[in-house]
């Protein structure tokens, strides 16, 4: 069995897919450069921070899938 510390492959794919979207949204109409936004998004995702767009979306999809079971 896998430790709860590690996410599933599907969850990791979802988080990776949403990381650039979250970085783009945080950089849009702000003084932050896109590279800074992407770096902060990746750091937040590695820390599993709930404020991170990609982690938030992944957790939301997992919550909906669990409720549908």
Swiss-Prot record:
Q: Which Gene3D superfamilies match?
A: Ribosomal protein S7 domain
Q: Name one GO cellular component term.
A: ribosome
Q: In the record, what terms sit under GO molecular function? A: rRNA binding
Q: What InterPro entries is this protein classified in?
A: Ribosomal_uS7_dom, Ribosomal_uS7_dom_sf
Q: Which UniProt keywords apply?
A: Ribonucleoprotein, Ribosomal protein, RNA-binding, rRNA-binding
Question: Pfam families attached here?
Answer: Ribosomal_S7
Top-rank lineage group of the source organism: Archaea
Please name the SUPFAM superfamilies in this protein's record.
Ribosomal protein S7 (SSF47973)
Q: Which family does it belong to?
A: Belongs to the universal ribosomal protein uS7 family.
Quaternary assembly: Part of the 30S ribosomal subunit.
Role: One of the primary rRNA binding proteins, it binds directly to 16S rRNA where it nucleates assembly of the head domain of the 30S subunit. Is located at the subunit interface close to the decoding center.
The protein depicted here goes by the name Small ribosomal subunit protein uS7
